[in-house]
């Protein structure tokens, strides 16, 4: 019988897996990476500001946290001036901050699973968190060049995060 990792590799290369892949079973998700912009919100708790400056709240009776996009909390109020509003979170953390993550990563059986840093949000989510979903979608149509610049900026940040994780 193949390991979870081997089975997924067989699926990816069009080989001969010995069973259906069960979603994320081949991945050991590593949470709590120091340079992650994500900040945990608690159902019914106080609003929390993430590394991008986005304030999120998780009201009781809802399926999860979502950004506050009122005038007080919206990070990027004008896509044509996004550089004035949007500041990427820091990525440079000392080795000591990585110690727990390194130890948890070393404990993963790499024959059985892939080690994967769990980072959220992604590109689109970051855009709509910063702009509000309505403004984000409108700006894709009305200001595609500015949206492309913002996406490049977010991508550069995510690449810097990836470099930190791989180091």
Role assignments for model-derived ranges:
Residues 1-167:
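Catalytic cores of TIM-barrel enzymes
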């Amino acid at each position: 019988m193949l390991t979870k990792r081997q089975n997924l590799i067989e699926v990816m290369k069009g080989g001969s897996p010995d069973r259906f892949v069960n979603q994320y079973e081949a991945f050991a998700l590593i949470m709590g990476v120091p340079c992650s912009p994500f900040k945990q919100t608690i159902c019914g708790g106080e609003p929390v500001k993430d590394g991008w400056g986005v304030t999120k709240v998780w009201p009781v009776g809802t399926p999860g946290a979502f950004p506050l996009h009122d005038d007080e909390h919206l990070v990027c109020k004008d896509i044509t001036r996004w550089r004035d509003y949007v500041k990427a979170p820091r990525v440079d953390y000392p080795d000591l901050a990585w110690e727990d993550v390194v130890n948890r990563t070393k404990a993963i059986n790499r024959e059985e699973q892939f080690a994967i840093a769990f980072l959220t949000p992604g590109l689109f989510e970051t855009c709509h968190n910063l702009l509000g979903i309505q403004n984000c979608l409108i700006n894709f149509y009305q200001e595609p060049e500015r949206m492309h610049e913002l996406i490049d900026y977010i991508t550069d940040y995510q690449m810097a995060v990836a470099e930190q994780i791989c180091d």
